[in-house]
Design a protein with these regions (language model features):
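Beta-strand-centric surfaces of beta-sandwich/beta-rich domains
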Residues: 1-105
Length: 105
């Protein structure tokens, strides 16, 4: 298993895990919080691999502006071969957290 911090604040794509040649990035669990109302989703390079996560105070989450998942051995989502794992943000606001992942074939 490998671990990555989520430290993003730019509108658009923010690289969380760099691409690994010939490999996929399989996300097992994640947790993050934002400093304001915004939307976020994970991408394999530029292709969305999750639905939109609405980081606002109208959803039930670990914090008023956060998203989290339970740990699982089968994985939640993965990138395409040789592509980076990115987090896309809809507004400029600080987002921080962490994720656990595997590098697979």
């Amino acid at each position: 298993m490998k671990y990555a911090k989520i430290d993003a604040s730019t509108v658009g794509s923010n690289t969380i895990v760099a691409a690994v040649a010939g490999k996929r990035i399989l996300v097992l669990v994640y947790s993050f919080m934002g400093s304001g109302n915004q939307n976020a989703y994970f991408c394999s390079d530029a292709t969305a691999i999750t639905g939109t996560l609405y980081l606002n105070n109208h959803i039930r989450s670990t914090a008023a502006y956060g998203a989290t998942t339970p740990a699982g051995a089968v994985g939640l989502f993965r990138t395409e071969i040789g592509e980076a794992l990115n987090l896309v943000l809809s507004t400029t606001a600080n987002v921080g957290g962490h994720l656990t992942y595997l590098v697979t074939d």
